[in-house]
Amino acid sequence: MMQYDLATMGNHDFDNGIDGFYAQLPHAKFDFVSANYDFKNTILNDIVKPYKIIIKDGIKIGIFGLGVQLDGLVDKKLYKETVYNNPIEVAQDMTRILKEEKKCDLVICLSHLGFKYKDEPEKPSDILLAQKTKNIDLIIGGHTHTFLDKPVIEKNSEGKDVLINQVGCFGLNLGRIDFYLSDNNEVINKGKNIIV
């Protein structure tokens, strides 16, 4: 049976307030990561971590989460003292930690920023995240409910490829992305599929 390894948080996770989200955590059989929401003065402090490292078949995978600006989407009384930090700046720090300090073979961002915003090109999005950072191999996106029939390849700040995928919403579609690594765990190829 398929299961989750990890999830990030988005605006709808606050629909029943931060206390409502906290009350549901015992039902989740996986952890939550969010690097740009600072929960230090909330009940989620020390529960939602900025990143997690998972080892699968000897491959060290660093995964971090990013969430959308809550102000204007969610009533302040629902997210309380949660502080939103610039996701692009936070991502640069996360990738440095995961790739350079922790020596992860793959770095994945679970994003709830949205794919892109035509009318607001400088608003943090998956496209902007890929372009303005380095060391992210894959961005798995949400928020804008964008259905991509195949992942988008965007160049990062060093001119290297970053895969961005978003498969719509409501669990209607599944995405699958395979990374092929050499014997010394360097990415040599990326395979992409969408399962409808």
Regions found by a protein language model. Give the residues of each.
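Acidic, metal/ion-coordinating pockets
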Residues: 1-195
